[in-house]
Amino acid sequence: MREKQQGTTGAGGMSSGAAAASPGQRHASIVEMLSTPPPAIVVQTGMEDENVRATGGETAADGDERRTLSRQSSTSSTESHASATSCLTKVHAQKWQHIELSQLVEENKLVFINAEMSVEEAFNTLVEHNLTSLPVERYPGDMDCVTFDYNDLNSYLLLVLGKTTVADEEITRQCQSGQPVPVGRIVKLTPKNPFYKVPETEDLSTVMGILGSGVHRVAIVDSTSSSIRGILSQRRLMKYLWDNARQFSNLEVLLNSSLQKLGIGVLDPHTPPTSRQSRVISILDTEPLLVALHKMHTERISSIAVIDHQGMLLGNISVTDVKQVTRTSQYPLLHNTCRHFISVILNNRGLEMGKDSFPIFHVYPTSSLARTVAKLVATKAHRLWIVQPVEQGVLVSPPVAPTTIDGSSEFSSRHVSPSPAPSPAGSHGPLTTSASPLGTLDKEYSTGKLIGVVSLTDILGLLARKHTENKLVDPLSARRQRGSVAR
């Protein structure tokens, strides 16, 4: 479950083959570089380099000889230098629907945690291994394990702060008195989808039907022993299809079609979502960060759009950002505005990356599916916000300025330089300031009025309906199963 979740601003990434521009030179837009699938690369059989395997692999922990599908698939990984160079380059002759899951499994080691481990230790394990979710075992070899992720950490934080309540009075008392709480008890507080297990002899068509319904990941198991061989996440499947899109000619028509034509994404925030659309959930930039975290908790979502009073998209806050407020010294951020939090994160990311960064987590109704998938893959995001382009001459709110921890802001005249550089495992430490990653914006980086959202689930559901026998796949079924918290 190494699925990298969307960050606060979904910073863009530059392709590895793109040369860095000089400070005074306009940088090429990421979508100009990534709107078409990577060129086909013929890989010789027998090569040992993990970067040329069908799905890259990474040793996550010693002592566990289980296997995983990819660097990002066993436990939802955050940004890493290794993943920036992990390209899925294996060429397949058959249609993608018929590829057996066994062909994608690569030997690796999974990271599991015991249900008796404290929430604090579980969080430290996430950070130590640069992950965003971990399987929680009640006993070694537990086949019905659930996962601990940042949604659980968010629920725990809200419980500690007294912003939510649960029926278990003992857990409430332990949380609010600072006592260690077993992670196995916390994960039970957040509704989960079933732990789906798919035999490795099944093909991608089967998995597409499951992931296209909104399930975030499935376990790939040995067909004889039923032991887990790996975990396939929505994003890793999307990356696999994108990186090999030139080999799958039946994807061409869909990739060249616009979101509007395909009918995916909510294109009107006032229109109720259908069975094939996701809801647009946003928060005003003037609201406290704590309200945003609570809203993500109640709505069972992993990210939320930040807008101004005119409905203009300003930024994005992800549930993974809760790691930025786990220390007592960071608690003041909880009561400051969402706009302030976004600016602080931009500064922090700029310092960690060593380069300027700017969010490109939006697309337009007229954007092609290819451009949308390219941005999802490049930003490691789960969803992109659909905006209506700003008409010339229309005044809109200025973009969020990177802000220091004390609230001061600074702007730079430099041009934007999207970067795929990773966020280090220690990114949950104190937030610091850096030079502003915002500067003169060209049309590609301007946003607009929030009118919709398109997610990995929407796209995988579309592929399932168009190219598999799963014609009735409902992208919202898994979310309805998880439910929302009564307010």
From Swiss-Prot:
Key word Membrane present: no
Transmembrane residue ranges: none
PROSITE patterns, sorted: CBS
Pfam families: CBS
The name this protein goes by in its record: Protein SDS23
Top-level division of the source organism's lineage: Eukaryota
Purpose: Involved in DNA replication and cell separation.
GO terms under biological process: cellular response to glucose starvation; regulation of mitotic metaphase/anaphase transition
Annotated organism of origin: Eremothecium gossypii (strain ATCC 10895 / CBS 109.51 / FGSC 9923 / NRRL Y-1056)
Ranges annotated as biased composition (Low complexity): 70-84, 414-430
Recorded family membership: Belongs to the SDS23 family.
Keyword Transmembrane helix: no
Domain CBS: 105-165, 189-248, 274-333, 396-469
Cellular localization per UniProt: Cytoplasm; Nucleus
Keywords: CBS domain, Cytoplasm, Nucleus, Repeat
Region (Disordered): 1-39, 56-84, 406-439
GO cellular component: cytoplasm; nucleus
Single annotated GO MF: protein serine/threonine phosphatase inhibitor activity
